[in-house]
Amino acid sequence: MKEKVVLAYSGGLDTSIIIPWLKENYEDIDVIAVCGNVGQEDKMEDVYEKALQSGASKAYVDDISEEFVTETIFKAVKAEAKYEGKYLLGTSLARPIIAKKLVEVAHKEGAKYICHGCTGKGNDQVRFEATIAALDPTIKVIAPWRIWDIKSREDAIDYAEKHNIKVTATKAKIYSVDANLWHVSTEGGDIEHLENEHKKDVYKQCVDPEDACDVAEYVEVYFEKGVPKKVNGEELSPVALIHKLNELGCKHGIGVIDIVENRLVGMKSRGIYETPGGTILYEAHNILESATLDKDTLHFKQMVSYKYGELIYNGLWYCKLRESIDAFMEQTQDNVTGTVKVKLYKGNIKPAGIFTENALYDEGISSFGNSELYDHKDAEGFINLFTLPLKIRAMKAGK
């Protein structure tokens, strides 16, 4: 009886050549290709056909975009999770959902192996394998990029040509692109040279901010307990909401970043990330929290958010700490309900209004006018006590 290998399949260069490679290097195996649709723009029927044409014995193409949004993206929005203060974790958030689907199919098919096309230098190999280990440690992983003779994307293209596999990558334009509903990342090629300004042709969604619409646009986002529900007054499904914000953000050049990041595996890498809708959501959520969370909760949440983002980036979605932080984040969102109005213009997002019944901001107290709850004279006593440690230190130092 043939062994079964479940392959994380995208239809791209790497995973397309893995199918014939597996059949050449492992005897009596069936390759079962699994593509989890997390909102990438590829035509799923084409991906299905390509998997079979490349030699897969069976292919699954499942739409998991709703789960992607509700189970990972919206949790990240509540936490305002970022990696190294900039990256909105587009690839990192998708991997645990895809890996979970791989494990489910492996169980269904009775497969002992899962194979992925992640390179030996990247973070994704860790993300996939950490999820697989957490969900079923008995499953064995095959990682071709760590063992085969193919050493570069140029080599991979040559292999594809020899096996009559059609791919979109060329040696002239060697970008590596990862796309889903939340973002598009572009790496490789001339981007790898730090002295190069990235070219406009790297953009897959957004217009360059310089070329964006000359007319500003206002957008309203309604949140209920930290979860986005409406855009411009229209209630939308989670997936449709992200699509709508992407559409609005793209034409204004929102959410384009060019960063050098520290990979989990120890090296630095440079990438161009486009997260138009996500950037609008993060900014709107941040604005709403600034008005509805007390200082101590907000400041502590910001500290914890950094760790939360790091855990996601490192592939530890299914660790106990991430789940525990989620419980805290959920508590912080009780009063994060209301509408935020923002202004989009040439890559920028500006606050344009906060509408909530839960604001801790009180105009009467915050203004320079009189207030029954606050007497200006009270500040003197507060300052005396607040600065007491500084005074004592200065007195001791003066001896």
From Swiss-Prot:
Subunit structure comment from the entry: Homotetramer.
GO biological process annotation, one example: L-arginine biosynthetic process
Major enzyme class: ligase
Pathway(s) annotated for this protein in UniProt: Amino-acid biosynthesis; L-arginine biosynthesis; L-arginine from L-ornithine and carbamoyl phosphate: step 2/3
EC number(s) on file: 6.3.4.5
One MF term in the entry's GO annotations: ATP binding
Record family assignment: Belongs to the argininosuccinate synthase family. Type 1 subfamily.
Compartment(s): Cytoplasm
Catalytic activity: L-citrulline + L-aspartate + ATP = 2-(N(omega)-L-arginino)succinate + AMP + diphosphate + H(+)
HAMAP family reported for this sequence: Arg_succ_synth_type1
Pfam family, one: Arginosuc_synth
Full protein name: Argininosuccinate synthase
Cellular component GO terms held in the UniProt record: cytoplasm
InterPro entries assigned: Arginosuc_syn_C, Arginosuc_syn_N, Arginosuc_synth, Arginosuc_synth_CS, Arginosuc_synth_type_1_subfam, AS_cat/multimer_dom_body, Rossmann-like_a/b/a_fold
Residues reported to bind L-aspartate: 119, 123-124
Protein species of origin: Clostridioides difficile (strain 630) (Peptoclostridium difficile)
Keyword Transport: no
